[in-house]
Each structure stands twice: as C-alpha cells, then as structure tokens.
Amino acid sequence: MLPTKKGGCFEHPLVKNLFVEKIPGGTSPLFPQPFIAYFTPIILKGDIVDLGCGKGINGFLIRLSRYLQGAKLIGLEINNDYINFCKKFNIYDQIIKQPLPKLPFKDKSVNLILCTEVIEHLTRKEGLILLDEIDRVCKGRTIITTPNIFFETMPGDPEDKHLSIWSIKDFKSRGYKVYGIGLKMPLLWGDKFLKIKQALYYFFTPISYIFPFISGSLIAVKDF
C-alpha cells in the first residue's frame, strides 16, 4: 500500500514523479488513462507490452488495478532516463531498449499491446510499419491513443516532436473501433485560456466519445 501521511499517496516518490511533476513521460489530467483502464481486461495473462512506455504510467496502473495471473509486463523504450526510472521502481518485469517501429516478438505471442501517445512521434511510413508489426505479434487486444490534432513541438523538447497525425479512417480501415476524448483544439502549457479549454475538454468528452471526429484525442481498440 502506498503511504498516506503528509499529503497522501502523492508523497510517494514514484507517484510524485508520475503524476505531479511536469516531466515528459508521465501523465497529465488531459491524458487518456481512465479510458485505457476501461478497455484493459480485469484479468491479465501472458505477455503485456507497453510500447514507448516512458516513465511507466501504464505499467504502474496495471499493477495497481488488475489481476495478473502469470502475466509478464514488458516495456519498450529508448530514453535512458525513462528506462532507469522504470528499473528503479520495478514497474515492468522486463524493459527492452528498442526503437520503433520493429517489435522484437514472435508472431501472435502478445496478449495485450498498449501504444499510448506514441504513434504520432513516428513518421507516417514508420507508423504504418508499426501497425503492421502490431497485427503480426498481437493475439489478444491492442489499445492505441493518439491526438486528433497536430501539436507543435514544445520549446526545448525536441524528443516529443510530433511527426504524423492519424485519422479515424486510418484505424477503422485496419479493424479498430475508434472512440474520442475531449474536444479538437490545441492544449498547451502556458496558454492563458488553458483552464477554460480543459473544462471544455471534459465537458465534451461524453459527446466526442460517441462522435470522435470532434475529439481532441482518439482511442482505437482492436481485438484479434
């Protein structure tokens, strides 16, 4: 159990780094973790792969909230700082330093693939290869999230540069069901209207979930 004194569980160094500090590789109130959790099975078995795992938010939440019956959590990442962070807190059973789009797994060997806020950091060509690789290795479910709007690179943060944008049609043509989150508008730290936009983001989510063409982010789910 996480400690609860002196400010609650956010005093725990892992939780503080994942949720509180504005460091890439963690999360923010605008990220789709509740929706990822909704589509993640309650009981997990076999290999669970988190592509571009960052600081391990997906792996951390899976360990907290799911029954792992012989499941093996595997993270793929290329950033050494993130890799060391995940190893320090034992978030994954195995973490592999592996650039995308190629995946180091056998055909139909992975039960669940998470690819959250990753594909937009690849070129269009690389992203299509990644989708082919996911089809090759996954035998269970794949969950992909990506912005439904192109974001400019934040100053001083070239690693987070967006190189492509993906549409509802791109995913549906490959057999994914697509849902929406938020409202299609730019959301950037430092925007003087950010709080208003955040409120609109939450307010419109029940609508954009059903009509993803107006959403700020897409969540694509495919069962194999």
What is each residue range found by the language model?
Residues 122-123, 138-139:
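Helix-to-beta-strand junctions that scaffold the AdoMet/dcAdoMet cofactor pocket
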